[in-house]
Amino acid sequence: MLFRSDALAKGAQLLTGGETTQNVLMPAHVVSGVTQDMKLFRDESFGPVVGVIRARDEAHAIKLANDTEYGLSAAVFTRDTARGLRVARQIKSGICHVNGPTVHDEAQMPFGGVGASGYGRFGGKAGIDSFTELRWITMETQPGHFPI
């Protein structure tokens, strides 16, 4: 609620959300008019809230996406998938989805962020590689015979 309250106090508009029902702990929220001075823009959130931020053009959208210390996951939505891939490659995040949600996890895929969102990669071989160091230990059980 902190992210939503801060954004609304600074001029953003609540497009949907806020309705409490008996079976929902926290309803989803869509907030429009989010600017760079709002917590919803600046801080990493795992709650059911999305901020709508308008960009002037593609370059501005990439700049906005990268203007944060966090970088767990991003998504690019477009009709032109080649353009979406080009944009995705410029966004500083551990994961970037083209035409898919920011939450997509598969056990065999490396999952993790960059910047303040990063502690390595979880999942499959990447998880093992991130949290282990390769060592080589040899042992001879019999004395060696070396020609000296």
Regions inferred by a protein language model and the residue ranges of each:
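Conserved C-terminal structural/oligomerization subdomain of aldehyde/semialdehyde dehydrogenase
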Residues: 22-148
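Short, small-residue-biased leader/transition segments that mark boundaries at the very start
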Residues: 1-2
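Short secondary-structure junctions
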Residues: 11-18
